[in-house]
């Protein structure tokens, strides 16, 4: 019995010795145990560099990774796997989390640049309006008109003024003017009325100053250009227009919102994000284009952007070429040239062209506030033709030599103003914001 007990004890001792050896061997392979530091707030997790004397601490060369997420129960929720992830991305900028909203343009959250471009949802901002190049000021126009009416011509030259029947006049003081001889008197009448309508709407900065003159071979103004008059085959006594000649004009291409190749217009409005990614210069351009579209609708001018829309049926790239009768001055202002098709002739054929003019107008839902106010004022007064003719009569001495606006055309002008006013109010009701309106 004793021998058996001693054998069992020896066997147990050998097993315990073997087990202890294994544990010692295993313990030697394990790294020393590291204690977690005491819990501290997340902002203290990274060591701080001592500030240099005489100034603030220098900014880190690379952006520091974001602090680890903190568990209020005391300890980091990030694991070694998370630390590996941070280490792998340390050479680049921190990734954007899925929950963080990305910066994009939408109707609900417009970019600051777009918000600054429009106020009240439908009006160009005052800041943009102030950046529109000045064009022709009232004082400049008045001075030029006074000089042109009394100036003597020393040359009449072909070219530089559009149609072959027109001439480029040079005055004794060296200034020049385009002399437009209409195929019929209504073209000169339409151009003169268009100029004064532009003044009535506050758009005169875009339309060259215009004066009327009578062709009189024996008159003082024409005395030195007798030969040129005979070569031009102008009828004695005809009324022509003198408009200020502008050097260094450049062609203008339709901006992207209307550069359609499929005949469909893309509406220009603030709410739809159409102003996204446009530069300041492009926005300033659009301010001028919206005025042009309103002006051409009111005058029923078919010889500018509307003619491009008409040509799309056989020329899908016409919108990528220069727009007729529209140029840019050296200062950047758009110049609305050759408005002979406006009002009189344009009104006679309005039924043919309004299928282009009306959709073009309805593609615009952002306006210059001053222009919109003038339109609404003329709509409320219901006296647009009377006010236009008063302005024309007051500033043009030869007003009686051309027929006044016929009653049917006067009524059509008022109807077009009413249509435009309703469109502005519709845009304001649909896209306007009460704050700032």
Curated annotation (Swiss-Prot):
GO terms for cellular component: extracellular space. InterPro entries: FJX1/FJ (IPR024868). It is found in: Secreted. Residues 1-24 form the signal peptide. Coiled coil: none annotated. Glycosylated. Undergoes proteolytic cleavage. Residues 57-66 have a biased composition (Pro residues). Residues 33-66, 88-116 are annotated as: Disordered. Glycans are attached at residue 248. Keywords: Glycoprotein, Secreted, Signal. It comes from the Eukaryota. GO terms for biological process: cell-cell signaling; retina layer formation. Its main location: secreted. Belongs to the FJX1/FJ family. Acts as an inhibitor of dendrite extension and branching. This is Four-jointed box protein 1. It comes from Homo sapiens (Human).
């Amino acid at each position: 019995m004793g021998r058996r007990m001693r054998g069992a004890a020896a066997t147990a001792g050998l097993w315990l010795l073997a087990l202890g050896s294994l544990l010692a061997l295993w313990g030697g392979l394990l790294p020393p145990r590291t204690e977690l530091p005491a819990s501290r707030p997340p902002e203290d997790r990274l060591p701080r560099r001592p500030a240099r004397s005489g100034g603030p601490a220098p900014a880190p060369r690379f952006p520091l990774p974001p602090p680890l997420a903190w568990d209020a129960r005391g300890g980091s929720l990030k694991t070694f796997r998370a630390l590996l992830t941070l280490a792998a991305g340390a050479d680049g900028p921190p990734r954007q989390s899925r929950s963080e909203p990305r910066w994009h343009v939408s109707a609900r959250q417009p970019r600051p640049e777009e918000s600054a471009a429009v106020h009240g949802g439908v009006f160009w901002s005052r800041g943009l309006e102030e950046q529109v190049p000045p064009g022709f000021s009232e004082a400049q126009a008045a001075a030029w008109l006074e000089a042109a009416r009394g100036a003597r011509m020393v040359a009449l030259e072909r070219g530089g003024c559009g149609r072959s029947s027109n001439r480029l006049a040079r005055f004794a003081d060296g200034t020049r003017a385009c002399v437009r001889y209409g195929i019929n008197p209504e073209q000169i009448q339409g151009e003169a009325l268009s100029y004064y309508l532009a003044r009535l709407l506050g758009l005169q900065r875009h339309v060259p100053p215009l004066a009327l003159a009578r062709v009189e071979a024996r008159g003082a103004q024409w005395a030195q250009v007798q030969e040129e008059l005979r070569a031009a085959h102008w009828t004695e006594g005809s009324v022509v227009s003198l408009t200020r000649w502008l050097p260094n004009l450049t062609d203008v291409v339709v901006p992207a919102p209307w550069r359609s190749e499929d005949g469909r217009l893309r509406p220009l409005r603030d709410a739809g994000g159409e102003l996204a990614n446009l530069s300041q210069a492009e926005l300033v351009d659009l301010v001028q284009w919206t005025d042009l579209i309103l002006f051409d609708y009111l005058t029923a001018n078919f010889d500018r952007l509307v003619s491009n829309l008409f040509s799309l049926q056989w020329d899908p790239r016409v919108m990528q070429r220069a727009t007729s009768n529209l140029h840019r001055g050296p200062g950047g202002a758009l110049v609305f040239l050759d408005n002979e098709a406006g009002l009189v002739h344009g009104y006679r054929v309005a039924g043919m062209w309004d299928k282009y003019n009306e959709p073009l107008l309805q593609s615009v839902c952002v306006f210059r506030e001053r222009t919109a106010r003038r339109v609404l004022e003329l709509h409320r007064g219901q006296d647009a033709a009377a006010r236009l003719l008063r302005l024309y009569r007051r500033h043009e001495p030869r007003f009686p030599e051309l027929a006044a606006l016929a009653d049917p055309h006067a009524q059509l002008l008022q109807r077009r103003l009413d249509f435009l006013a309703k469109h502005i109010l519709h845009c304001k009701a649909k896209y306007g914001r009460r704050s700032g309106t």
